[in-house]
Curated annotation (Swiss-Prot):
Statement: the UniProt record of this protein carries the keyword Mitochondrion: yes
Cofactor note: Binds 2 heme b groups non-covalently.
Record protein name field: Cytochrome b
Extra facts: Heme 1 (or BL or b562) is low-potential and absorbs at about 562 nm, and heme 2 (or BH or b566) is high-potential and absorbs at about 566 nm.
Parts forming coiled coils: none
Single GO MF descriptor: metal ion binding
UniProt-listed Pfam families: Cytochrom_B_C (PF00032), Cytochrome_B (PF00033)
InterPro entries listed in its UniProt record: Cyt_b/b6_C, Cyt_b/b6_C_sf, Cyt_b/b6_N, Cytb/b6-like_sf, Cytochrome_b, Cytochrome_b_C_euk/bac, Cytochrome_b_N_euk/bac, Di-haem_cyt_TM
Biological source species: Oryctolagus cuniculus
Gene name per UniProt: MT-CYB
Residues that bind a ubiquinone: 201
Gene Ontology biological process terms, A to Z: mitochondrial electron transport, ubiquinol to cytochrome c
SUPFAM superfamilies in alphabetical order: a domain/subunit of cytochrome bc1 complex (Ubiquinol-cytochrome c reductase), Transmembrane di-heme cytochromes
Keywords from the named record: Electron transport, Heme, Iron, Membrane, Metal-binding, Mitochondrion, Mitochondrion inner membrane, Respiratory chain, Transmembrane, Transmembrane helix, Transport, Ubiquinone
Transmembrane segments: 33-53, 77-98, 113-133, 178-198, 226-246, 288-308, 320-340, 347-367
Length: 379
């Protein structure tokens, strides 16, 4: 008799996605981040659900409801810090996943790549709105500064900002709607993840060489289920170490002060995972230009497939491109550092140089390097 997993309409889908899926035999640990992102999403949805049971989205009680969660709810402190630091783990995995895609040429799967970019924007929007919910100083001023950027849009800007705020400033209406959006978006993300996987399974996974691996496939289970489980254990261990030993390491102390519209914090800055984009935004003295650069800092990923000039897919055998890739990584780390610094000399100049280098590397230097490598290999 045929196994039920191969005949049952629902189990059949699971079987083709997670059990009998033909996978390349040589995919490295860099391919673990996809499943880790799935784990992060599940952790965030479950911890978020339990937080939402005790949180109140009202300006007068939001801050104290978070305090109540940490002090009075059973293991509330654990749920809260798992959720806050889970977001950091989410972004670490996201950036590693995108970096892997760039390095090994996974962006040539256009549909999968484009859904991935939409997912990145959706996760960033969710994280931003989540940061506003505790209604601390950095929550309030972060929301004010970032939403205010939309006023740079010609003609409709001011109206748009007031429409998003639900008034003439960030207030009760803003907090309530941000909570509603923050709650619904992860489920939209989960749906997009399924579409992401649907498109991926149309082509099958890429591998480190970038060479088609149809002649050498192995079943996903048990090989990659075991490998992913190891990844899960390592990730959970690292997250628990962070949560249980230094839960506030990545947070901002200003967010332990309740929101006060009359008192601006000396340095308004977002969470660490947005600092690179924030640095790019600040490096342009014009408001609209800054907003465009901010959006383009992520949207530039959509141009990468069309700038792929190399005859090879992966960077595995392309030393010049490899050097440029790691220059890009170093540049992003520099931007992250600059984003957390005050707007003064020499940080302004460093930020501007790093911003120019970021776009130049992706849009000009990498395609040029590919052409040079083709020439060297007489292709």
């Amino acid at each position: 008799m045929t196994n039920i997993r191969k005949t049952h309409p629902l189990l059949k889908i699971v079987n083709h996605s997670l059990i009998d899926l033909p996978a390349p035999s040589n995919i490295s640990a860099w391919w673990n981040f996809g499943s880790l992102l799935g784990l992060c999403l599940m952790i965030q949805i479950f911890t978020g659900l339990f937080l939402a049971m005790h949180y109140t989205s009202d300006t007068t009680t939001a801050f104290s409801s978070v305090t109540h969660i940490c002090r009075d709810v059973n293991y509330g402190w654990l749920i809260r810090y798992l959720h806050a630091n889970g977001a950091s783990m989410f972004f670490i995995c996201l950036y590693m996943h995108v970096g892997r895609g760039i390095y090994y040429g996974s962006y040539t799967y256009l549909e999968t790549w484009n859904i991935g970019i939409i997912l990145l924007f959706a996760v960033m929007a969710t994280a931003f709105m989540g940061y506003v919910l505790p209604w601390g100083q950095m929550s309030f001023w972060g929301a004010t500064v970032i939403t205010n950027l939309l006023s740079a849009i010609p003609y409709i800007g001011t109206t748009l900002v007031e429409w998003i705020w639900g008034g003439f400033s960030v207030d009760k209406a803003t907090l309530t709607r941000f909570f509603a959006f923050h709650f619904i978006l992860p489920f939209i993300i989960a749906t997009l993840v399924l579409i992401h996987l649907l498109f991926l399974h149309e082509t099958g996974s890429n591998n480190p060489t970038g060479i088609p691996s149809n002649s050498d496939k192995i079943p996903f289970h048990p090989y990659y289920t075991i490998k992913d489980t190891l990844g899960f254990l390592v990730a959970i261990l690292l997250l628990l170490i962070l949560v249980l030993f230094s839960p506030d390491l990545l947070g901002d102390p200003d967010n332990y002060t309740p929101a006060n519209p009359l008192n601006t914090p000396p340095h308004i800055k977002p969470e660490w995972y947005f600092l690179f984009a924030y640095a790019i935004l600040r490096s342009i003295p014009n408001k609209l230009g800054g907003v465009l650069a901010l959006v383009l800092s992520i949207l530039v990923l959509a141009f990468i497939p069309f700038l792929h000039m190399s005859k090879q897919r992966s960077m595995m055998f392309r030393p010049i491109s490899q050097v440029l890739f790691w220059v890009l990584v170093a540049d992003l780390l520099t931007l992250t550092w600059i984003g957390g610094q005050p707007v003064e000399h020499p940080f302004i100049t460093i930020g501007q140089v790093a911003s120019v280098l970021y776009f130049t590397t992706i849009l000009i230097l990498m395609p040029l390097a590919s052409l040079i490598e083709n020439k060297i290999l007489k292709w």
